[in-house]
């Protein structure tokens, strides 16, 4: 064949899988539904396939919250537009910053005119993928307000919630609701250097659910 008919291959890119593993020991918010799996059929005489049934909270592992999670009249995750979950993003390190991510913890990395519309913050040195962390780091609501002011449409974090684990008001979630942002939680950013990437973290089309698992990846810009 004529080589002119074939466009040049793009340069190779690195892919970071930033999804938490999901299994029976995956940590969940106290009282939430852990992952479990039962086999409905197994390969053997007269059965050519393995088929399982799984039960889990949609907040197990890396996930996207729907407005329905923090707003009684909010949209389910299956009705949330997908645009926010794919596109340019910035990974910011605020490791060991304390209970709340304040603007001072991230200003060095987000205070520029080229800030992408998606910001993911790493707070752990190593994310605890096999235990619940009741002292997790959350976003200060004022930080989300200022990110929204700068055009950010999605915020992410490597902890289980953008609010403190014992919060009864979910102040940061309420900023998300009021400003129309999207949120990703339980991301694994342990191996990801700070910088700009392409985020792909699409939720399932669960038409009545308050959240959805995502297979979140980052792709390095060529």
Residues covered by each model-derived region:
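Active-/binding-site microenvironments in catalytic and ligand-binding cores
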Residues: 2-222
